[in-house]
UniProtKB/Swiss-Prot annotation:
Ranges of Polar residues composition bias in the record: 846-857
Any one GO BP annotation for this protein: cAMP biosynthetic process
Gene this protein is translated from: pacA
Protein name as catalogued: Photoactivated adenylate cyclase subunit alpha
Annotated compartments: Cell projection, Cilium, Flagellum
Biased composition (Low complexity): 822-839
Source organism superkingdom: Eukaryota
PANTHER family found in the cross-reference section: ADENYLATE CYCLASE, TERMINAL-DIFFERENTIATION SPECIFIC, ADENYLATE CYCLASE, TERMINAL-DIFFERENTIATION SPECIFIC-RELATED
Keywords: ATP-binding, cAMP biosynthesis, Cell projection, Chromophore, Cilium, FAD, Flagellum, Flavoprotein, Lyase, Nucleotide-binding, Photoreceptor protein, Receptor, Repeat, Sensory transduction
Listed cofactors: FAD
One CC-aspect GO term: motile cilium
Domain BLUF: 55-148, 467-559
Organism of provenance: Euglena longa
Subcellular location, principal: other
Length: 1019
């Protein structure tokens, strides 16, 4: 249990989990709150009484490669060998088999488990080992078993247990390839991706464009081959990005976003060049009529600070956020104008070695969208890549009689039972729409309004009396006693009997597993009620299908897995509980279409590529670049997370499907007959932003200036899954995908928050079409556009930018005021005239020149005060102190080294850090690499380093904002002990760097001469 205390203990609220507590704190803007964890440690199971420490427990799932052999004798032989081996290395655990899956838990030390799991993973008797849990444990739960084995048939004949084990394991294994790589890596480490805190990191980011893909989509003769083109593009990107140490973040309609760590910049460029060569080789090998001969790529590369985080709640994306992501996208767009296949920023050039730098050619300074300052870019000496030439080649292309490997078929031409479930046909209660002024929902309520139910179209063709089965899992909102379970059984038995429903309900350690059988209308109605039942949370359907006859004869077969089954095999509840929790986590990252197809009992690899007409939606935050430039990375994550949750809520409530979450941008689609629903979703999104601004109007919160624009367009898209190298993407691509982004951008010029194209307007209801839209002066690609009429739907970009700059200025003034208030508080004497104030009272910014530096005789510097100074300055700014930095400062008080490389989350933390390290007069080495140091604040850094009379090494590497050396020259002049200043990855000219080193060498020689002279006089 977690307790949130705020207003100096006057208000207290309890929560069941930390995530719920954090959401409430953020939504309520509680800045002075403290979270306390209250828990009771249970007694260790038998085997944990030995006093062993540093133990770890690992649970994994795998699929048998020879399920026909896996009987009780086979498992017994396997367990006998494992027991002998595990006994020697001190590993305990159990093995459970439920055809065709193995579930195994092993316990031991880190070294033993790493060795054993490496051998297990390479065992040919199973495949696809997926870690379900991996973490430290206080003792052994299965200490008496070096390897306990059991076949599910030896534990129970209960069909519910077998059903849930098979269905969840099958779905879990199938969804694995659709996961973002970062989320998959988290799971392999035994971590829940949607529980991970945002992690700041320095990355080399690229956007890889499939050149003129929109022209390919617009070519009527190439529609059938689009799936083949996307599959080849995905495989080529994955192979070259991951082969050079990078990670693919996501695919976005013919665009690949990828990143590399800071030390793999050269590898990144090599991989991107190899990608271009691979596609050239692929083009040369194609027969006449193959559209693969039209694949070209272009890339833009940038380096900067980003936040690796989980964005979104109900539909999530584990991705990168930050200003450098937007800049990388702009550089790729600039490469189209410059006609080059690979373009990189100056920041990336700074990370390269001398040999690769010599291969680069300057492409000049260019203004890009969203940035006030021009960007310096570079290119390799490579053949020109002109999009106009590629477009002409595509337009003149004749596929002839060539047939695609994965042909795309029209959606309407398929039999209803064969159509993939690309639309959410969930029955919804009709609720009256209310306008913005009538809404009184809290922020938490608005973020949680998400309805999702997986009904495949194959089940919609049957009548209401069709016999179906539905299995779902959920977590109990609170622990269930025997009395609670008896009450549920009594009420449910009578209700199910009257509705002609049979089934079973299994309760396992806080987890409900229920199977319902009966007429479709009755089962659907009951399931909808269960989703609203406050005794459940995280309700997810795992299997649905028509059936010929019932499996269960009773209206409710109630089973608590704490009785006879667990007496036979107690670890069963651990397997079920962990498997269900992992499935719930995965479901948020996988496309809804794939989840619905899986839930119906199908293999997602059999999804038919289709072409279909849809209403496409795109939305993003207005003026996000100026808003995010002066916000911390955590604040950027908060803004995006709040906005994404609101968008997914509104879209799903209106029957839409979220396609991609791209930073602050959300794309989605609606059925062609749901234009009104799409407009209503747009109105909900815009209304939410207005409510957000009102909610935080009186506080300096970054969400108080959030506004958005939304665009709607209509057209044909292709839906297909692509990829075969361990990563699968469900792609929604079409000419309308690119055009809708232009429609959304038109909202700024039109002054309307919602802009729709004429094809969408033609599909609106007469009332909305005739009275609710107004023509825009401009269109997109010759298509007329309309804005939604109403004062609440107006958008003034000038006012939005004014509010953003005003917010940044107000926050800066508030920070200065807090500093002044802290200095002149009652009980403190005001500083005498001409005497500088303490570091805490100094305004955050450069206040004096290093050239005229004189020690302040009234200033006491104490290394033990560094952490306190940092925390105080952060609190005065209204920011939460970075615990990692505070710990480093605390450690440096008793050490002569301080390594803060890549530790800062944003420029807002730099000034408190500089004031704090001034206290550390004992330092010999200071690492400030990759920490937002630039020409505007290097003077403050130099002033902080002057009192460090023992300082010998200062590392300022990978700070591309550094271009001038005047402050560093003054530092060397006043602190002659400095022997080395590392400036790799900065924009300081090599000649200036050599001059600095010469000055330090002179200081060293002078010090040596003084030392020798004093030695002679001493004699």
């Amino acid at each position: 249990m977690y307790i949130l205390v705020w207003k100096e203990g006057q208000q207290i609220k309890t929560f069941q989990d930390l995530e719920e507590c954090g959401q409430f704190q953020i939504a309520s803007n509680i800045t002075d709150g403290q979270i306390f964890s209250v828990s009771v440690t249970p007694t260790m199971s038998k085997g944990g009484e030995t006093g062993e420490t540093q133990l770890r427990r690992l649970m994994y799932l795998s699929a048998s490669t020879e399920p026909e052999k896996c009987n009780a004798e086979y498992l017994a032989d396997m367990a006998h060998v494992a027991t002998l081996r595990n006994k020697q290395i001190g590993v305990s655990g159990f093995l459970l088999y439920s055809s065709p899956f193995f579930f195994q838990v092993i316990e031991g030390t880190d070294e033993d488990l790493d060795f054993l799991f490496a051998k297990i993973s390479s065992d040919p008797r199973h495949e696809r080992c997926i870690v379900l849990a991996n973490g430290p444990c206080t003792g052994r739960m299965y200490g008496e078993w070096h390897m306990k084995d059991s076949h599910i048939d030896n534990i129970t004949k209960h069909p519910a247990i077998k059903t849930i084990l098979f269905q969840i394991a099958r779905s879990f294994s199938s969804m694995w390839s659709y996961l973002p790589k970062n989320a998959a890596n988290m799971l392999l480490l035994g971590k829940n991706p949607n529980k991970q805190a945002p992690e700041p990191m320095s990355v080399v980011v690229t956007f890889i464009y499939l050149v003129e893909f929109s022209s390919i989509l617009a070519h009527p003769g190439l529609t059938e081959q689009c799936a083949d083109i996307l599959a080849a593009f995905v495989d080529a990107c994955v192979r070259n990005v991951e082969g050079t140490g990078g990670q693919v973040a996501k695919f976005i309609t013919g665009i690949c976003m990828a990143y590399w760590p800071i030390n793999r910049a050269e590898d990144a460029l090599v991989g991107l060049q190899q990608l271009s060569e691979d596609l050239a080789e692929l083009r040369s090998q194609q027969p006449p009529g193959s559209a693969l001969s039209l694949i070209y790529s272009r890339c833009g590369v940038h380096y900067g600070r980003a936040l690796l985080c989980n964005a979104g709640f109900r539909k999530a994306d584990f991705t990168l956020l930050g200003d450098c992501i937007n800049t990388a996208s702009r550089i790729t767009s600039l490469s189209v104008k410059l006609k080059v296949p690979l373009l990189l920023s100056f920041e990336v050039r700074c990370l390269l070695g001398d040999e690769m730098r010599e291969e680069l050619e300057s492409a000049g300074l260019h203004k890009v969208k969203g940035r006030d300052k021009p960007v310096q870019v570079y290119q390799f000496n490579a053949p020109e890549l002109d999009s106009a030439v590629v477009r002409t080649k595509i337009e003149q292309f004749n596929p002839g009689r060539y047939r695609a490997l994965c042909p795309v078929k029209p959606y309407d031409s398929l039999h209803p039972a064969q159509r993939p479930p690309i639309f959410d046909d969930t029955p919804r209660d009709s609720q009256p729409k209310v306008n913005q002024m009538q809404r009184r929902d809290s922020l938490v309520d608005r973020l949680s309004m998400i309805a999702k139910l997986a009904f495949p179209s194959s089940m919609m063709v049957g009548g209401e009396s069709q016999l179906i089965t539905l299995t779902y899992i959920s977590q109990a909102a609170h622990p269930m006693s025997r009395l609670d379970l008896s009450s549920i059984q009594r009420v449910s038995f009578s209700r199910n009997e009257s509705s002609n429903i049979t089934g079973s309900l299994l309760y396992v350690n806080g987890l409900f597993v229920q199977t319902l059988e009966g007429p479709k209308s009755a089962v659907v109605s009951l399931y909808l009620k269960i989703r609203q039942d406050k005794r459940h949370k995280d309700v997810v359907a795992v299997f649905m299908a028509p059936i010929e006859e019932r499996v269960y004869g009773s209206p409710l077969d109630m089973t608590a897995a704490t009785e006879e089954m667990l007496a036979t095999f107690p670890p069963l509840q651990d397997v079920l509980s962990q498997l269900a929790k992992s499935f719930i986590s995965l479901e948020t990252y996988v496309p809804s279409t794939v989840v619905r197809y899986l839930t119906a009992g199908n293999n997602p690899r059999n999804l038919q590529p289709v072409s279909v007409e849809v209403v496409m939606l795109a939305t993003d935050i207005c003026s996000f670049t100026p808003l995010s430039e002066r916000c911390s990375l955590t604040e950027v994550w908060t803004i995006c997370n709040t906005f994404i949750d609101a968008c997914t809520s509104a879209i799903c409530n209106e029957g839409g499907e979220v396609i991609k979450l791209i930073g602050d941008c959300v794309t989605a689609y609606f059925p062609p007959t749901a234009a009104d629903n799409a407009v209503h979703a747009c109105q909900e999104i815009v209304s939410f932003c207005a409510q957000l601004r009102d909610a935080f109007r009186d506080v300096l919160d970054c969400r108080s200036v959030v506004a958005c624009g939304v665009g709607l367009d209509f057209g044909q898209v292709i839906m297909a899954q692509c990829g075969s190298l361990g990563m699968t993407e469900f792609v929604v691509a079409g000419e309308v995908s690119a055009r809708v982004m232009e429609v959304e951008a038109l909202t700024r010029e039109a002054g309307r928050a919602i802009v729709i194209t004429e094809p969408v307007a033609d599909r609106l209801s007469p009332k909305l079409r005739d009275t609710g839209i107004v023509p825009c002066q401009e269109g997109v690609d010759g298509v007329p556009c309309y804005g939604i009429l109403g004062v609440e739907w107006e958008l003034d970009v000038a006012i939005i930018k004014k509010n953003i700059y005003g917010f940044h200025e107000a926050r800066a003034q508030a920070a200065l005021k807090k500093v002044d208030d802290g200095t002149n508080a009652p009980g403190r004497g005001a500083p005498a005239a001409g005497v500088p104030s303490s570091p805490k009272a100094r305004a955050l910014g450069r206040t004096s020149s290093v050239s005229s530096y004189t020690p302040d005789l009234n200033e006491t510097l104490d290394p033990r005060m560094a952490e306190s100074v940092f925390n105080d300055l952060c609190n005065q700014r209204g920011d939460a102190p970075n615990n990692s930095i505070a710990a480093k400062l605390r450690q440096a008080a008793n050490d002569d080294r301080l390594d803060l490389g890549r530790m800062l989350q944003g420029p807002h933390e730099l000034m408190p850090v500089l004031q704090a390290i001034k206290q550390l007069t004992n330092l010999r080495m200071l690492n400030m690499s990759d920490n937002f140091v630039d020409d505007n604040n290097v003077g403050e850094l130099a002033e902080s380093c002057i009192p460090m009379r023992s300082l010998q090494v200062l590392d300022l590497s990978n700070n591309p904002g550094l271009t001038k050396v005047i402050a560093l020259k003054r530092l060397i002049k006043h602190n002659t002990q400095i022997r080395e200043i590392l400036l790799n990855g900065t924009r300081i000219a090599p000649m200036e760097q050599r001059k600095l080193q010469s000055s330090m060498n002179v200081n060293r020689m002078c010090a040596s001469t003084d030392s020798k002279s004093s030695h002679k006089y001493d004699h």
